[in-house]
From Swiss-Prot:
Subunit structure: Part of the 50S ribosomal subunit.
Function: One of two assembly initiator proteins, it binds directly to the 5'-end of the 23S rRNA, where it nucleates assembly of the 50S subunit. One of the proteins that surrounds the polypeptide exit tunnel on the outside of the subunit.
Keyword Ribosomal protein: yes
Name used for this protein in its record: Large ribosomal subunit protein uL24
One cellular component term from this protein's GO annotations in UniProt: ribonucleoprotein complex
Gene3D superfamilies linked to this entry: 2.30.30.30
Origin organism lineage: Bacteria, Pseudomonadati, Pseudomonadota, Gammaproteobacteria, Lysobacterales
Family: Belongs to the universal ribosomal protein uL24 family.
Length: 105
């Protein structure tokens, strides 16, 4: 089954504390995604001299639920829904619902 979102897609956050922010999908974990420069949390880390890690507070991105993002349509500059189009040879393409343009082409 084809996925509605993929790693590297440009998305916009539609709900939560970071509503309106845009970023790129870094990682997908089931129904949660990590988006660059969105949903920063502070992590307390111990120093580890073997790995060269200094201790303290580290800001990093935390995952958000996939229902809180929409894929960014570059033609309109807004979030858009994703649809699928099946070609004659059986290929399944992702398309923007509002414009019908193929995503990533």
């Amino acid at each position: 089954m084809a996925s509605r979102i993929k790693k590297g897609d440009q998305v916009i956050v539609i709900a939560g504390k970071d509503k309106g922010k845009q970023g790129e999908i870094i990682r997908i974990d089931g129904h949660r995604v990590v988006v660059s420069n969105v949903n920063f949390v502070k992590r307390h880390t111990k120093p580890n001299p073997q790995r060269g890690i200094s201790g303290g507070l580290i800001d990093r991105e935390a995952p958000i639920h996939v229902s809180n993002i929409k894929i960014l349509n570059p033609m309109t500059g807004k979030g858009d829904r994703v649809g699928f189009k099946i070609l004659g040879d059986g290929c399944k393409l992702r398309i923007f619902r509002s414009t019908g343009e193929v995503i990533g082409a």
